[in-house]
């Protein structure tokens, strides 16, 4: 009959908006995603915010502390599920910078902080827009060896 199943399970309804970049926490407790008015590239949508639901019943989790009046978009979980890194244009509305926030055992986020740089002026001088942060447990270094992350 051309159908895949008899029921459709919906864990979140975006209410005439778009939900993009869904990522489940490593402990399978939460689903974090970006919600915007439309489309699938929310880094260009000022209204884009991070949203999260509990996967133990689909209840929304308060993410207000993560969001600003500008764009919050792509995000990544730490391997232990207690930290996230995400892209935001909250500082100037023009350039994307990475922010980090902690998620406690009760599902409450801490206030996000700007990803530290070896030279703090780098956050003001950088003219490129980085959109897709990923947390990794693998050692990284730049091709010219100007930075190394152990």
Could you describe each region identified by the protein language model?
Residues 1-150:
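Sequence signature of WD/YWTD-type beta-propeller architectures
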């Amino acid at each position: 009959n051309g159908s895949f199943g008899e029921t459709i399970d919906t864990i979140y309804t975006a209410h005439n908006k778009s939900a993009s970049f869904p990522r489940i926490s490593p402990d399978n407790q939460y689903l974090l995603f970006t919600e915007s008015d439309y489309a699938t590239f929310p880094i260009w949508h000022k209204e884009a915010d991070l949203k999260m639901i509990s996967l133990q019943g689909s209840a929304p989790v308060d993410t207000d502390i993560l969001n600003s009046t500008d764009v919050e978009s792509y995000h990544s979980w730490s391997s232990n599920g207690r930290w996230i890194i995400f892209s935001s244009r909250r500082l100037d509305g023009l350039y994307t910078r990475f922010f980090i926030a902690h998620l406690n055992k009760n599902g409450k986020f801490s206030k996000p902080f700007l990803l530290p740089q070896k030279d703090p002026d780098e956050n003001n001088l950088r003219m490129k827009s980085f959109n897709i942060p990923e947390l990794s447990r693998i050692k990284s270094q730049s091709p010219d060896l100007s930075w190394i992350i152990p």
